[in-house]
Swiss-Prot record:
Similarity comment: family membership: Belongs to the major facilitator superfamily. TCR/Tet family.
Residue ranges crossing the lipid bilayer per the database entry: 12-32, 49-69, 77-97, 102-124, 138-158, 165-185, 197-217, 225-245, 263-283, 286-306, 342-362, 396-416, 431-451
Membrane-topology annotation of the record: Multi-pass membrane protein
Protein name: Putative multidrug resistance protein MdtD
Spans within the Periplasmic topological domain: 1-11, 70-76, 125-137, 186-196, 246-262, 307-341, 417-430
Length: 470
């Protein structure tokens, strides 16, 4: 990094700020959801759509981001991503209804989907390969700080200003970032193959319609017959994509990926695993505020140990997998996360609040070990010709499963709560207790998939793939 010219350093700073904006926004909103519900006159049971709309949009748009950057240029797309993200933030702050807020979050998600993958591509183009790892470490560090600051910052802004400021703070940062991108970043383009628009549309329709069908009865009052039609339509779109990919060599994601057994198992396990774990960052601050009566600031502070545990575990997870193997680590962390989530609920309902930071620290550590192991398992055996496509598909599945997880969590709250939730009441405690029991079962189920994973303990497998991903 010391030998890089000044203009390259500035370009890395621009990418780093983009990573920070995107990662901050994934966690800062969760703490503010109860306050948003009160301000908008909505039930807290409907507020999960604020999270789902953003994460699902990111999942849908991810496959197109790399192609757009190659075709139109990394500067143009990164500039557009920051502008869209900033405009989305402004519209979020100006929203007067839940529907307006959800639409604004969709616009924000379009920008967020392009920001991180295009940022990675930019680093690859402006930095020599010998310094690529150091450069990626530099630009991704703010992305790790964002989730740490997000809950606490969101709590401070909600408690001492209003929820609108969690979006307004993005505007000055976005303006500076857009100007710096336009002036300092080179606009690299390369020859691209034809974009698989039919495949992209089939996947986008399938993901969006299936998620809507999962949640429509509670949030939108859609009739059961309409929901059944939506579910059938979404499933048909996914099946049509599989048929399309089988016949088309230039498909968005080649079916040759699934000839690698560890990729198939890892992708299926990642999808199922992140549905369960994706519920926790959404449900925890909601429960702390609505179930236990914590202030937004206090609830935000309580989330910090979980992020610290996650960051700390990344330093030793490679050695753990090398020692015990993928199967043992994945099964143990999956079951362990389910048990820790039940421990959190038990400690909270017993009133032992002083133990909550320790439990959340443990939850972050277990979750991080599982995430890192799942990612490595999924990609480690792919041939180089398919590695980029496999990584893109994994990124899309990660976002999709998180949106499904939040949707299911909201559905469970609605089912047990029946629209009647009050602050720190006995009935509310029962609602969250039943919801957490269901969540624990959902979190534990992927252990069945991971039990089929080969228990590979070769030392170079994890470490070499970890380096390659950076």
């Amino acid at each position: 990094m010391t030998e890089l010219p000044d203009n390259t350093r500035w370009q890395l700073w621009i990418v780093a700020f983009g990573f920070f904006m995107q990662s901050l926004d994934t966690t800062i909103v969760n703490t503010a959801l109860p306050s948003m519900a009160k301000s908008l006159g909505e039930s807290p049971l409907h507020m999960h759509m604020v999270v789902v709309s953003y994460v699902l949009t990111v999942a849908v748009m991810l496959p197109a981001s790399g192609w757009l950057a190659d075709k139109i240029g990394v500067r143009n797309i990164f500039f557009a991503a920051i502008v869209l993200f900033t405009l989305g933030s402004l519209f979020c702050a100006l929203s007067g209804t839940l529907n307006q807020l959800v639409l604004a979050r969709v616009l924000q998600g379009v920008g967020g989907a392009m920001m991180v993958p295009v940022g990675r591509l930019t680093v690859m183009k402006i930095v020599p390969r010998t310094q690529y790892m150091a450069a990626m470490t530099f630009v991704t560090l703010p992305g790790q700080i964002g989730p740490l600051l997000g809950p606490a910052l969101g709590g401070v802004l909600v408690e001492y200003a209003s929820w609108h400021w969690i979006f307004l703070i993005n505007i000055p940062v976005g303006i500076v970032g857009a100007m710096a991108t336009f002036m300092l970043m080179p606009n690299y383009t390369i020859e691209t193959r034809r974009f698989d628009l039919p495949g992209f549309l089939l996947l986008a329709i399938g993901m969006a319609v299936l998620t809507l069908a999962l949640d429509g009865s509670k949030s939108m009052g859609i009739s059961p017959w309409t929901l059944a039609g939506l579910a059938a339509g979404g499933a048909a779109a996914i099946l049509l994509y599989l048929f399309h990919a089988k016949k088309n060599s230039g498909a968005l994601f080649s079916l040759r990926l699934f000839r690698t057994p560890t990729f198939s198992l890892g992708l299926l396990g990642s999808f199922a695993g992140r549905i369960g774990s994706g519920m926790l960052p959404f449900m925890t601050p909601v429960f702390l505020q609505i179930g236990l009566g914590f202030s937004p600031f206090h609830a935000g502070l309580m989330m910090i140990p979980m992020v610290l545990g996650s960051m700390g575990m990344k330093r030793i997870v490679v050695q753990i997998v090398n020692r015990f193997g993928y199967r043992r680590v994945l099964v143990a962390t999956t079951l362990g996360l389910a048990l820790v989530s039940l421990l959190f609920m038990s400690v909270a309902l017993l009133g032992w609040y002083y133990l909550l930071p320790l439990v959340l620290l443990l939850q972050g550590m277990v979750n991080s070990a599982r995430f890192s192991s799942m990612n490595t398992l999924t990609l480690k055996d792919l041939p180089d010709t398919l590695a980029s496509s496999g990584n893109s598909l994994l990124s899309m599945i990660m976002q999709l499963s998180m949106s499904i997880g939040v949707t299911i969590a909201g559905m469970l709250l609605g089912m047990f709560g029946q629209q009647h939730i009050g602050i720190d009441s006995s009935a509310t405690h029962h609602v969250f207790m039943y919801t957490w029991l269901c969540m624990a079962v959902i979190i534990a189920l992927p252990a069945i998939i991971f039990a089929r994973v080969p228990n590979d303990t070769q030392q170079n497998m994890v470490i070499s793939r970890r380096k390659r991903s950076l």
